[in-house]
Amino acid sequence: MFNNLTERLSQSLRKIINKGRLTEENIKDTIREVRKALLEADVTLSVIKKFIQNVSKKAIGHEINKSLTPGQEFIKIVKNELILSMGEKNHDLNLSIQPPAIILVVGLQGVGKTTTLVKLAKWIKEKYKKKILTVSTDIYRAAAIKQLQILSDQVKIDFYLSDTTQTPINITKEAIEHAKLKLYDLLLIDTAGRLHINTEMMNEINTIQNISKPIETLLIVDSMMGQDAINIAKKFSASLSISGIVITKTDSDARSGVALSIRHITGKPIKFIGTGEKLHQLEPFHPERIADRILGMNQVISLIKDIEEKVNQSQVKNLTKKFRKGDDFNLNDFLIQLKEMKNMGNLNYFIEKFSKNKILSNNPLLGENKNTLNRIEAIIYSMTHKERMHPIIIKGSRKRRIALGSGTKIQDVNKLLKNFDNIKKIMKKIKKGGIGKMIRNISNILPKNF
Protein backbone atom coordinates (compact mmCIF):
# COMPACT_ATOMS: atom_id res chain seq x y z
CA MET A 1 0.00 0.00 0.00
CA PHE A 2 2.80 2.42 0.87
CA ASN A 3 5.42 1.22 -1.62
CA ASN A 4 4.56 3.64 -4.44
CA LEU A 5 4.51 6.64 -2.12
CA THR A 6 7.81 5.50 -0.59
CA GLU A 7 9.35 5.32 -4.06
CA ARG A 8 8.09 8.77 -5.09
CA LEU A 9 9.06 10.50 -1.85
CA SER A 10 12.50 8.90 -1.94
CA GLN A 11 13.06 10.36 -5.40
CA SER A 12 11.80 13.77 -4.26
CA LEU A 13 13.83 13.96 -1.05
CA ARG A 14 17.04 12.70 -2.63
CA LYS A 15 17.46 16.07 -4.34
CA ILE A 16 17.70 17.98 -1.09
CA ILE A 17 19.60 15.58 1.14
CA ASN A 18 23.00 17.24 0.60
CA LYS A 19 21.93 20.89 0.64
CA GLY A 20 24.05 23.14 2.87
CA ARG A 21 21.05 25.16 4.01
CA LEU A 22 17.30 25.26 3.46
CA THR A 23 16.01 28.23 1.47
CA GLU A 24 12.72 28.97 -0.25
CA GLU A 25 14.50 28.60 -3.59
CA ASN A 26 16.22 25.25 -3.03
CA ILE A 27 13.21 23.53 -1.43
CA LYS A 28 10.73 24.77 -4.05
CA ASP A 29 11.29 21.88 -6.47
CA THR A 30 11.30 19.32 -3.67
CA ILE A 31 8.05 20.69 -2.23
CA ARG A 32 6.47 20.47 -5.68
CA GLU A 33 7.62 16.86 -6.08
CA VAL A 34 6.30 15.95 -2.62
CA ARG A 35 2.94 17.47 -3.57
CA LYS A 36 2.86 15.38 -6.76
CA ALA A 37 3.72 12.25 -4.79
CA LEU A 38 0.82 12.88 -2.40
CA LEU A 39 -1.58 13.54 -5.30
CA GLU A 40 -0.54 10.28 -6.97
CA ALA A 41 -1.12 8.50 -3.65
CA ASP A 42 -4.74 9.72 -3.75
CA VAL A 43 -4.41 11.85 -0.62
CA THR A 44 -7.35 14.23 -0.13
CA LEU A 45 -6.68 17.72 -1.51
CA SER A 46 -7.41 19.50 1.76
CA VAL A 47 -4.89 17.26 3.52
CA ILE A 48 -2.25 17.90 0.85
CA LYS A 49 -2.77 21.66 1.08
CA LYS A 50 -2.33 21.69 4.84
CA PHE A 51 0.63 19.29 4.66
CA ILE A 52 2.53 21.40 2.10
CA GLN A 53 1.82 24.65 3.95
CA ASN A 54 3.12 23.23 7.22
CA VAL A 55 6.25 21.70 5.68
CA SER A 56 7.10 24.93 3.83
CA LYS A 57 6.54 27.09 6.89
CA LYS A 58 8.64 24.86 9.16
CA ALA A 59 11.46 24.31 6.66
CA ILE A 60 12.22 27.90 5.68
CA GLY A 61 14.15 29.71 8.39
CA HIS A 62 13.93 26.68 10.66
CA GLU A 63 16.76 26.32 13.16
CA ILE A 64 18.76 23.26 12.19
CA ASN A 65 19.58 20.66 14.80
CA LYS A 66 23.39 20.60 15.07
CA SER A 67 23.49 16.82 14.77
CA LEU A 68 21.55 16.88 11.49
CA THR A 69 22.31 18.21 8.03
CA PRO A 70 19.74 20.62 6.50
CA GLY A 71 18.60 17.82 4.20
CA GLN A 72 18.11 15.47 7.13
CA GLU A 73 16.24 18.21 8.99
CA PHE A 74 13.88 18.60 6.02
CA ILE A 75 13.19 14.86 6.01
CA LYS A 76 12.51 15.07 9.74
CA ILE A 77 9.98 17.86 9.10
CA VAL A 78 8.27 15.76 6.41
CA LYS A 79 8.17 12.78 8.77
CA ASN A 80 6.62 14.84 11.58
CA GLU A 81 3.93 16.15 9.23
CA LEU A 82 3.14 12.62 8.07
CA ILE A 83 2.70 11.65 11.71
CA LEU A 84 0.43 14.64 12.37
CA SER A 85 -1.71 13.76 9.34
CA MET A 86 -2.22 10.21 10.60
CA GLY A 87 -2.94 11.06 14.22
CA GLU A 88 0.31 11.56 16.18
CA LYS A 89 0.00 8.51 18.45
CA ASN A 90 -1.33 4.98 18.70
CA HIS A 91 -4.85 4.69 20.13
CA ASP A 92 -5.29 1.44 22.02
CA LEU A 93 -8.64 -0.25 22.53
CA ASN A 94 -10.60 0.92 25.52
CA LEU A 95 -11.47 -2.25 27.43
CA SER A 96 -11.75 -0.70 30.89
CA ILE A 97 -15.33 -1.54 31.74
CA GLN A 98 -17.35 -4.00 33.78
CA PRO A 99 -17.49 -7.24 31.71
CA PRO A 100 -18.66 -8.00 29.20
CA ALA A 101 -17.07 -5.17 27.23
CA ILE A 102 -18.70 -4.95 23.81
CA ILE A 103 -17.05 -4.09 20.51
CA LEU A 104 -19.31 -3.35 17.55
CA VAL A 105 -17.85 -3.81 14.06
CA VAL A 106 -19.44 -1.92 11.16
CA GLY A 107 -18.73 -1.28 7.48
CA LEU A 108 -19.83 -1.94 3.92
CA GLN A 109 -20.06 -5.42 2.43
CA GLY A 110 -16.81 -6.80 1.02
CA VAL A 111 -14.36 -4.70 3.03
CA GLY A 112 -13.19 -7.64 5.15
CA LYS A 113 -15.38 -6.87 8.15
CA THR A 114 -16.00 -10.42 9.41
CA THR A 115 -12.38 -11.52 8.93
CA THR A 116 -11.17 -8.36 10.68
CA LEU A 117 -13.47 -9.04 13.64
CA VAL A 118 -11.89 -12.49 14.11
CA LYS A 119 -8.37 -11.09 13.66
CA LEU A 120 -9.18 -8.54 16.35
CA ALA A 121 -10.59 -11.21 18.67
CA LYS A 122 -7.42 -13.28 18.21
CA TRP A 123 -5.19 -10.25 18.86
CA ILE A 124 -7.07 -9.31 22.05
CA LYS A 125 -7.07 -12.90 23.30
CA GLU A 126 -3.29 -13.19 22.84
CA LYS A 127 -2.44 -9.77 24.27
CA TYR A 128 -4.92 -9.45 27.12
CA LYS A 129 -5.82 -13.11 27.83
CA LYS A 130 -9.54 -12.33 27.69
CA LYS A 131 -12.44 -14.76 27.49
CA ILE A 132 -14.09 -13.75 24.21
CA LEU A 133 -17.40 -14.42 22.46
CA THR A 134 -18.30 -13.51 18.87
CA VAL A 135 -21.75 -13.17 17.29
CA SER A 136 -23.09 -12.27 13.85
CA THR A 137 -26.22 -10.16 13.35
CA ASP A 138 -25.95 -10.44 9.56
CA ILE A 139 -29.13 -12.31 8.62
CA TYR A 140 -29.10 -11.01 5.03
CA ARG A 141 -25.92 -12.34 3.45
CA ALA A 142 -25.86 -16.03 2.62
CA ALA A 143 -23.50 -17.97 4.92
CA ALA A 144 -22.44 -14.83 6.85
CA ILE A 145 -23.20 -16.45 10.21
CA LYS A 146 -21.46 -19.68 9.16
CA GLN A 147 -18.38 -17.74 8.02
CA LEU A 148 -17.95 -16.11 11.42
CA GLN A 149 -18.46 -19.47 13.15
CA ILE A 150 -15.78 -21.18 11.03
CA LEU A 151 -13.25 -18.37 11.49
CA SER A 152 -13.90 -18.19 15.25
CA ASP A 153 -13.33 -21.94 15.52
CA GLN A 154 -10.01 -21.59 13.68
CA VAL A 155 -8.64 -19.23 16.34
CA LYS A 156 -10.30 -21.16 19.20
CA ILE A 157 -12.69 -18.38 20.20
CA ASP A 158 -16.26 -19.08 21.32
CA PHE A 159 -19.10 -18.27 18.93
CA TYR A 160 -22.74 -17.54 19.76
CA LEU A 161 -24.89 -19.31 17.19
CA SER A 162 -27.65 -17.07 15.86
CA ASP A 163 -30.35 -17.84 13.31
CA THR A 164 -31.45 -16.09 10.11
CA THR A 165 -35.07 -16.31 11.29
CA GLN A 166 -34.24 -13.94 14.16
CA THR A 167 -33.96 -10.18 13.93
CA PRO A 168 -30.56 -8.50 14.40
CA ILE A 169 -31.96 -6.77 17.48
CA ASN A 170 -33.04 -10.03 19.14
CA ILE A 171 -29.71 -11.67 18.28
CA THR A 172 -27.89 -8.77 19.93
CA LYS A 173 -29.98 -8.95 23.11
CA GLU A 174 -29.61 -12.73 23.42
CA ALA A 175 -25.85 -12.65 22.81
CA ILE A 176 -25.38 -10.00 25.51
CA GLU A 177 -27.37 -12.03 28.02
CA HIS A 178 -25.39 -15.16 27.14
CA ALA A 179 -22.10 -13.27 27.55
CA LYS A 180 -23.18 -12.06 30.99
CA LEU A 181 -24.41 -15.49 32.07
CA LYS A 182 -21.22 -17.28 30.97
CA LEU A 183 -18.93 -14.55 32.37
CA TYR A 184 -17.28 -13.51 29.11
CA ASP A 185 -14.87 -10.58 29.28
CA LEU A 186 -15.60 -9.41 25.77
CA LEU A 187 -18.33 -9.70 23.14
CA LEU A 188 -17.60 -8.79 19.52
CA ILE A 189 -20.68 -8.11 17.39
CA ASP A 190 -20.51 -8.40 13.61
CA THR A 191 -23.12 -6.30 11.81
CA ALA A 192 -24.60 -6.66 8.34
CA GLY A 193 -22.92 -4.78 5.52
CA ARG A 194 -24.48 -3.36 2.38
CA LEU A 195 -23.12 -2.59 -1.06
CA HIS A 196 -23.73 1.08 -0.30
CA ILE A 197 -24.88 3.18 2.65
CA ASN A 198 -28.65 3.48 3.06
CA THR A 199 -31.08 4.69 5.71
CA GLU A 200 -32.29 1.17 6.60
CA MET A 201 -28.74 0.00 7.26
CA MET A 202 -27.87 2.99 9.43
CA ASN A 203 -31.08 2.74 11.43
CA GLU A 204 -30.41 -0.94 12.16
CA ILE A 205 -26.82 -0.31 13.29
CA ASN A 206 -27.93 2.67 15.37
CA THR A 207 -30.48 0.48 17.16
CA ILE A 208 -27.88 -2.25 17.81
CA GLN A 209 -25.48 0.39 19.11
CA ASN A 210 -28.11 1.86 21.44
CA ILE A 211 -29.00 -1.59 22.82
CA SER A 212 -25.46 -2.93 23.21
CA LYS A 213 -23.77 0.31 24.37
CA PRO A 214 -20.39 -0.79 22.97
CA ILE A 215 -17.20 0.54 24.49
CA GLU A 216 -15.76 0.54 20.95
CA THR A 217 -17.48 0.93 17.58
CA LEU A 218 -14.94 0.21 14.86
CA LEU A 219 -15.48 1.16 11.23
CA ILE A 220 -13.77 -1.18 8.74
CA VAL A 221 -12.66 0.45 5.47
CA ASP A 222 -10.99 -1.06 2.42
CA SER A 223 -7.76 0.70 1.41
CA MET A 224 -8.36 -0.30 -2.22
CA MET A 225 -11.46 1.92 -2.40
CA GLY A 226 -9.35 5.09 -2.33
CA GLN A 227 -11.35 8.32 -2.03
CA ASP A 228 -14.59 6.32 -1.84
CA ALA A 229 -13.36 4.90 1.47
CA ILE A 230 -12.88 8.46 2.76
CA ASN A 231 -16.40 9.46 1.73
CA ILE A 232 -17.90 6.30 3.26
CA ALA A 233 -16.04 6.91 6.53
CA LYS A 234 -17.33 10.48 6.58
CA LYS A 235 -20.95 9.31 6.18
CA PHE A 236 -20.61 6.61 8.85
CA SER A 237 -19.08 9.12 11.26
CA ALA A 238 -21.95 11.52 10.67
CA SER A 239 -24.56 8.84 11.46
CA LEU A 240 -22.86 6.72 14.14
CA SER A 241 -20.70 7.23 17.18
CA ILE A 242 -17.49 5.76 15.75
CA SER A 243 -14.57 5.27 18.16
CA GLY A 244 -11.96 4.18 15.63
CA ILE A 245 -11.12 2.92 12.16
CA VAL A 246 -9.51 -0.26 10.85
CA ILE A 247 -7.98 -0.13 7.35
CA THR A 248 -7.87 -3.48 5.54
CA LYS A 249 -5.79 -4.81 2.64
CA THR A 250 -2.78 -2.59 3.30
CA ASP A 251 -0.62 -5.34 1.78
CA SER A 252 -2.22 -4.63 -1.61
CA ASP A 253 -1.10 -2.27 -4.37
CA ALA A 254 -3.69 0.27 -3.23
CA ARG A 255 -2.61 3.88 -2.98
CA SER A 256 -1.93 5.14 0.53
CA GLY A 257 -4.22 8.16 0.48
CA VAL A 258 -6.71 6.51 2.84
CA ALA A 259 -4.21 6.23 5.69
CA LEU A 260 -3.01 9.81 5.23
CA SER A 261 -6.47 11.37 4.85
CA ILE A 262 -9.04 9.52 6.92
CA ARG A 263 -8.06 10.86 10.35
CA HIS A 264 -8.08 14.46 9.10
CA ILE A 265 -11.47 14.07 7.38
CA THR A 266 -13.33 12.12 10.09
CA GLY A 267 -11.51 13.15 13.25
CA LYS A 268 -11.46 9.45 14.21
CA PRO A 269 -8.22 7.58 14.98
CA ILE A 270 -6.96 4.66 12.91
CA LYS A 271 -6.61 1.86 15.46
CA PHE A 272 -5.54 -1.12 13.36
CA ILE A 273 -4.44 -2.09 9.86
CA GLY A 274 -4.92 -5.43 8.14
CA THR A 275 -1.64 -6.55 6.58
CA GLY A 276 -2.72 -9.76 4.83
CA GLU A 277 -5.42 -12.40 4.52
CA LYS A 278 -4.24 -14.66 7.35
CA LEU A 279 -5.85 -14.33 10.76
CA HIS A 280 -2.67 -13.17 12.51
CA GLN A 281 -2.13 -10.35 10.02
CA LEU A 282 -3.53 -7.43 11.99
CA GLU A 283 -1.36 -4.72 13.54
CA PRO A 284 -2.05 -1.80 15.88
CA PHE A 285 -1.68 1.43 13.92
CA HIS A 286 1.35 3.47 14.99
CA PRO A 287 1.59 6.72 12.97
CA GLU A 288 5.31 7.11 13.65
CA ARG A 289 6.09 3.60 12.43
CA ILE A 290 3.99 4.14 9.31
CA ALA A 291 5.78 7.44 8.66
CA ASP A 292 9.10 5.58 8.97
CA ARG A 293 7.76 2.97 6.58
CA ILE A 294 6.69 5.59 4.04
CA LEU A 295 10.14 7.17 4.23
CA GLY A 296 11.80 3.74 3.95
CA MET A 297 13.26 3.71 7.48
CA ASN A 298 11.33 1.00 9.25
CA GLN A 299 12.59 -2.37 8.02
CA VAL A 300 15.49 -2.73 10.46
CA ILE A 301 13.42 -1.61 13.48
CA SER A 302 10.52 -3.86 12.47
CA LEU A 303 12.83 -6.84 11.93
CA ILE A 304 14.44 -6.42 15.35
CA LYS A 305 10.96 -6.40 16.94
CA ASP A 306 9.99 -9.57 15.06
CA ILE A 307 13.22 -11.33 16.03
CA GLU A 308 12.65 -10.46 19.69
CA GLU A 309 9.28 -12.21 19.46
CA LYS A 310 10.82 -15.29 17.81
CA VAL A 311 13.81 -15.94 20.07
CA ASN A 312 14.03 -16.32 23.83
CA GLN A 313 15.18 -13.45 26.01
CA SER A 314 18.61 -14.92 26.82
CA GLN A 315 19.36 -15.09 23.10
CA VAL A 316 18.23 -11.48 22.69
CA LYS A 317 20.49 -10.35 25.57
CA ASN A 318 23.50 -12.19 24.16
CA LEU A 319 22.90 -10.72 20.72
CA THR A 320 22.56 -7.22 22.19
CA LYS A 321 25.85 -7.54 24.10
CA LYS A 322 27.70 -8.60 20.98
CA PHE A 323 25.92 -5.94 18.95
CA ARG A 324 27.15 -3.22 21.29
CA LYS A 325 30.71 -4.60 21.36
CA GLY A 326 31.39 -3.82 17.72
CA ASP A 327 35.14 -4.38 18.09
CA ASP A 328 34.60 -7.89 19.54
CA PHE A 329 32.15 -9.10 16.92
CA ASN A 330 33.86 -11.62 14.61
CA LEU A 331 32.90 -14.14 11.95
CA ASN A 332 32.41 -16.88 14.56
CA ASP A 333 29.76 -14.71 16.23
CA PHE A 334 28.28 -13.95 12.83
CA LEU A 335 28.10 -17.67 12.07
CA ILE A 336 26.17 -18.26 15.31
CA GLN A 337 23.67 -15.57 14.32
CA LEU A 338 23.25 -17.13 10.87
CA LYS A 339 22.40 -20.45 12.50
CA GLU A 340 19.84 -18.76 14.74
CA MET A 341 18.26 -17.12 11.69
CA LYS A 342 18.01 -20.49 9.97
CA ASN A 343 16.45 -22.02 13.07
CA MET A 344 13.77 -19.34 13.42
CA GLY A 345 11.58 -21.24 11.01
CA ASN A 346 10.03 -18.47 8.96
CA LEU A 347 13.19 -17.07 7.38
CA ASN A 348 11.48 -15.97 4.19
CA TYR A 349 9.24 -13.66 6.25
CA PHE A 350 12.29 -11.76 7.53
CA ILE A 351 13.96 -11.70 4.12
CA GLU A 352 10.77 -10.28 2.61
CA LYS A 353 10.84 -7.42 5.11
CA PHE A 354 14.36 -6.49 4.04
CA SER A 355 13.73 -6.98 0.34
CA LYS A 356 11.20 -4.13 0.41
CA ASN A 357 13.89 -1.69 1.52
CA LYS A 358 15.65 -0.04 -1.41
CA ILE A 359 18.88 0.39 0.56
CA LEU A 360 19.09 -3.18 1.79
CA SER A 361 17.50 -5.13 -1.05
CA ASN A 362 20.82 -5.74 -2.84
CA ASN A 363 22.62 -7.02 0.24
CA PRO A 364 23.97 -10.51 -0.56
CA LEU A 365 23.74 -11.41 3.13
CA LEU A 366 19.96 -11.25 2.70
CA GLY A 367 19.67 -13.80 -0.07
CA GLU A 368 16.51 -15.21 -1.50
CA ASN A 369 16.31 -18.33 0.66
CA LYS A 370 18.09 -20.72 3.00
CA ASN A 371 20.46 -21.77 0.21
CA THR A 372 22.06 -18.34 0.38
CA LEU A 373 22.73 -18.72 4.09
CA ASN A 374 24.09 -22.20 3.47
CA ARG A 375 26.54 -20.70 0.98
CA ILE A 376 27.66 -18.05 3.47
CA GLU A 377 28.07 -20.75 6.12
CA ALA A 378 30.22 -22.78 3.74
CA ILE A 379 32.49 -19.77 3.14
CA ILE A 380 32.98 -19.17 6.87
CA TYR A 381 33.54 -22.89 7.58
CA SER A 382 36.30 -22.87 4.96
CA MET A 383 38.22 -20.27 6.98
CA THR A 384 40.74 -21.02 9.70
CA HIS A 385 40.03 -20.00 13.29
CA LYS A 386 42.50 -17.14 12.94
CA GLU A 387 40.79 -15.92 9.77
CA ARG A 388 37.39 -15.93 11.44
CA MET A 389 38.74 -13.98 14.40
CA HIS A 390 40.68 -11.51 12.21
CA PRO A 391 39.05 -11.27 8.75
CA ILE A 392 41.40 -8.41 7.86
CA ILE A 393 44.17 -10.95 7.14
CA ILE A 394 42.14 -12.60 4.37
CA LYS A 395 43.89 -11.52 1.17
CA GLY A 396 44.38 -12.94 -2.35
CA SER A 397 45.71 -16.46 -1.76
CA ARG A 398 43.53 -16.99 1.32
CA LYS A 399 40.45 -15.88 -0.64
CA ARG A 400 41.23 -18.36 -3.42
CA ARG A 401 41.64 -21.19 -0.89
CA ILE A 402 38.37 -20.28 0.90
CA ALA A 403 36.43 -20.03 -2.38
CA LEU A 404 37.78 -23.39 -3.53
CA GLY A 405 37.02 -25.04 -0.18
CA SER A 406 33.46 -23.70 -0.05
CA GLY A 407 32.60 -24.30 -3.69
CA THR A 408 31.97 -20.60 -4.28
CA LYS A 409 33.59 -17.78 -6.23
CA ILE A 410 36.17 -15.27 -4.99
CA GLN A 411 33.54 -12.57 -5.64
CA ASP A 412 31.25 -14.29 -3.11
CA VAL A 413 34.02 -14.21 -0.51
CA ASN A 414 34.66 -10.53 -1.27
CA LYS A 415 30.97 -9.69 -0.88
CA LEU A 416 30.75 -11.49 2.45
CA LEU A 417 33.84 -9.70 3.82
CA LYS A 418 32.69 -6.32 2.54
CA ASN A 419 29.25 -6.62 4.08
CA PHE A 420 30.62 -8.01 7.33
CA ASP A 421 32.86 -4.95 7.50
CA ASN A 422 29.80 -2.72 6.99
CA ILE A 423 28.00 -4.48 9.83
CA LYS A 424 30.99 -3.86 12.12
CA LYS A 425 30.98 -0.17 11.19
CA ILE A 426 27.30 0.10 12.09
CA MET A 427 27.98 -1.60 15.43
CA LYS A 428 30.80 0.82 16.21
CA LYS A 429 28.45 3.72 15.54
CA ILE A 430 25.97 2.26 18.01
CA LYS A 431 28.75 1.72 20.54
CA LYS A 432 29.91 5.34 20.27
CA GLY A 433 26.67 7.25 20.02
CA GLY A 434 23.71 4.94 20.34
CA ILE A 435 21.16 3.82 17.78
CA GLY A 436 19.87 7.35 17.14
CA LYS A 437 23.27 8.58 16.00
CA MET A 438 23.77 5.48 13.89
CA ILE A 439 20.47 6.06 12.06
CA ARG A 440 21.32 9.72 11.41
CA ASN A 441 24.61 8.69 9.79
CA ILE A 442 23.41 5.50 8.11
CA SER A 443 23.73 6.99 4.61
CA ASN A 444 27.44 7.62 5.22
CA ILE A 445 28.07 4.09 6.55
CA LEU A 446 26.45 1.97 3.88
CA PRO A 447 27.85 1.77 0.36
CA LYS A 448 25.36 2.37 -2.43
CA ASN A 449 25.22 -1.31 -3.36
CA PHE A 450 24.72 -2.57 0.21
From Swiss-Prot:
Keywords: Cytoplasm, GTP-binding, Hydrolase, Nucleotide-binding, Ribonucleoprotein, RNA-binding, Signal recognition particle. It is found in: Cytoplasm. It catalyses: GTP + H2O = GDP + phosphate + H(+). Disulfide bonds: none annotated. InterPro entries: AAA+_ATPase (IPR003593), P-loop_NTPase (IPR027417), Signal_recog_part_SRP54_M_sf (IPR036891), Signal_recog_particl_SRP54_hlx (IPR013822), Signal_recog_particle_SRP54_M (IPR004125), SRP (IPR004780), SRP/SRP_N (IPR036225), SRP54 (IPR022941). GO terms for cellular component: signal recognition particle. It is an enzyme of class 3 (hydrolase). The keyword RNA-binding applies. GO terms for biological process: SRP-dependent cotranslational protein targeting to membrane. One of its GO terms (molecular function) is GTP binding. GTP binds at residues 107-114, 190-194, 248-251. It comes from the Bacteria. The keyword Cytoplasm applies. Gene3D superfamilies: P-loop containing nucleotide triphosphate hydrolases (3.40.50.300), Signal recognition particle SRP54, nucleotide-binding domain (1.20.120.140), Signal recognition particle, SRP54 subunit, M-domain (1.10.260.30). CDD domains: SRP_G. Its EC number is 3.6.5.4. Involved in targeting and insertion of nascent membrane proteins into the cytoplasmic membrane. Binds to the hydrophobic signal sequence of the ribosome-nascent chain (RNC) as it emerges from the ribosomes. The SRP-RNC complex is then targeted to the cytoplasmic membrane where it interacts with the SRP receptor FtsY. Interaction with FtsY leads to the transfer of the RNC complex to the Sec translocase for insertion into the membrane, the hydrolysis of GTP by both Ffh and FtsY, and the dissociation of the SRP-FtsY complex into the individual components. HAMAP family: SRP54. Composed of three domains: the N-terminal N domain, which is responsible for interactions with the ribosome, the central G domain, which binds GTP, and the C-terminal M domain, which binds the RNA and the signal sequence of the RNC. NCBIfam families: ffh (TIGR00959). Part of the signal recognition particle protein translocation system, which is composed of SRP and FtsY. SRP is a ribonucleoprotein composed of Ffh and a 4.5S RNA molecule. Belongs to the GTP-binding SRP family. SRP54 subfamily. This is Signal recognition particle protein. The lineage of its organism: Bacteria, Pseudomonadati, Pseudomonadota, Gammaproteobacteria, Enterobacterales. The gene is ffh.
